[in-house]
């Protein structure tokens, strides 16, 4: 806004917005509504935060006539068996998307549809698991409440000390703003966005320091983790976080310190007291750790 950029938010539900951001309510699954809003607003940049259906991306590529479409994706990479992922590790898929897709599969197909366009001006931001205040997945709450109760935390022995795929919501927002800056050459490129060098162990120990308690980690084989015990995994078959070289070099992105993210997230936790559904199995976890 300080640079004279008008920001317009949108979604299916009408919402009251403040002085500096206006709002357009529409259903993106209805092409006529999407076309109407894009025609009326005529955005230079379209930031797509929530899409994981390839048909909706295809509609955007047909109807958006601006300068840059920024698609927020996820860790679309194949299993890399503990190697940090680089942007080029994702290869667009062959064939046509199936009728039913989970979130990860949907994001992969969305990126595939973008890659199949000829000249469409897309840019992709790829965050891994995102946490921060009001995290609707409650995954970060799973670790906060387990550290707070003083019992042991079950972690995957194969992967808890290697770099994990984690990002702070503010860092992802900053990366999106950088990607929306038309002065940067991000034409038809993807960018990794995450913490750097932060493992699951670092996360848990950071939470414990912020709470003033001693962390109690109990490593066990990944395959033996009870459901919901460690929502961030990490699955040892997956990538060990991201390589951030391209985002640094081309966008000017730098990840924040873990401590800054935890301070803000812990303040939310202490007020809201959220609980992850997997915490219902806490007695089973304690029994596995021999602490029941």
Residue ranges of model-derived segments:
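Alpha-helical substrate-binding/gating segment
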Residues: 144-154, 162-198, 209
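NAD(P)H-binding glycine-rich loop region in Rossmannoid oxidoreductase-like domains
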Residues: 14-67, 71, 77-79
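Conserved glycine-rich Rossmann-like NAD(P)H-binding loop of the short-chain dehydrogenase/reductase
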Residues: 5-12, 16
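Conserved beta-loop-beta element that borders a ligand/cofactor-binding pocket
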Residues: 111-134
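Mid/C-terminal beta-alpha module of Rossmann-like enzyme folds, strongest
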Residues: 178-238, 264, 273-292
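Active-site helix of classical SDR
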Residues: 106
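Active-site "gating" loop of Rossmann-like NAD(P)-dependent oxidoreductase/epimerase domains
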Residues: 74-102, 116-118
């Amino acid at each position: 806004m300080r640079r004279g950029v008008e920001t317009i938010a949108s979604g299916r539900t009408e919402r009251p917005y403040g002085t500096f951001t206006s709002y357009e309510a529409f259903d993106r699954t209805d092409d006529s509504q999407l076309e109407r809003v894009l025609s009326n607003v005529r955005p230079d940049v379209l930031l797509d935060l929530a899409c994981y259906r390839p048909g909706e991306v295809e509609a955007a590529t047909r109807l958006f006539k601006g300068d840059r479409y920024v698609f927020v994706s996820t860790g679309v990479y194949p299993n890399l068996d503990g190697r940090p992922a680089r942007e080029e590790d994702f290869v667009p898929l062959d064939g046509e998307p199936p009728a039913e897709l989970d979130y990860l599969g949907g994001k992969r197909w969305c990126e595939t549809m973008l890659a199949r366009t000829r000249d469409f001006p897309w840019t992709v931001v790829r965050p891994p698991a995102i946490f921060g205040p009001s995290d609707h997945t409650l995954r970060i709450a799973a670790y906060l409440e387990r550290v707070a109760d003083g019992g042991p935390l079950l972690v995957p022995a194969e992967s808890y000390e290697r770099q994990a795929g984690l990002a702070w919501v503010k860092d992802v927002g900053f990366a999106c703003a950088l990607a929306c800056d038309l002065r940067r050459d991000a034409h038809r490129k993807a960018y990794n966005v995450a913490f750097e060098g932060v493992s699951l162990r670092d996360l848990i120990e950071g939470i414990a320091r912020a709470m003033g308690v001693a962390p109690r980690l109990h490593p066990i084989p990944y395959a033996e983790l009870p459901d919901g015990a460690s929502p961030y995994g990490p699955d040892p078959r997956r990538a060990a976080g991201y390589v951030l070289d391209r985002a640094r070099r081309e966008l000017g992105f730098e990840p924040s310190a873990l401590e800054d993210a935890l301070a803000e997230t812990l303040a939310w936790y202490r007020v809201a007291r959220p609980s992850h559904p997997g915490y219902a199995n806490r007695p089973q976890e304690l029994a596995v750790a021999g602490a029941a």
